[in-house]
């Protein structure tokens, strides 16, 4: 389990409704459900990740957050979590506005782009590194 999951869980009260945008394989949702009795729902673009969530019994919708968040009603969740995903959006400002509309509060975590290895890879190769915590290329 990622250390980040514990930090996010500490920010969320028990027994709340949480939307995890860019939920990946559902690991964070599963952790929040088990540890905090949180009612979770995910939104994920990748079909394989959606299938993993379904296999784990987690409620997930396949969709693109940039084009489909408008379908969620205002204040329909207590919290919205956006974990390690913001950097992948073409229009992050619009995504954040939608998250603030959907949830009463929003928790956002981003990769540490100041880490020297990340900066060196960007400088010398012009690309973001692929790691265990950021396995997707973009």
Q: PLM features: residue spans?
A:
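Alpha-helix C-terminal capping/helix-to-coil transition sites in glycosyltransferase folds
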Residues: 14, 75-76, 102
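S-adenosyl-L-methionine-dependent methyltransferase catalytic module, highlighting the catalytic core
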Residues: 93-101, 105-138
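A short acidic, Gly/Pro-enriched loop at the edge of an enzyme's catalytic core
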Residues: 71-79
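Class I SAM-dependent methyltransferase SAM/SAH-binding core
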Residues: 27, 31-68
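A short SAM/SAH-binding and catalytic strip from SAM-dependent methyltransferases
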Residues: 79-91
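Conserved alpha-helix/loop element of class I SAM-dependent methyltransferases that forms part
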Residues: 1-15
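Class I SAM-dependent methyltransferase "Motif I" SAM/SAH-binding loop
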Residues: 22-24
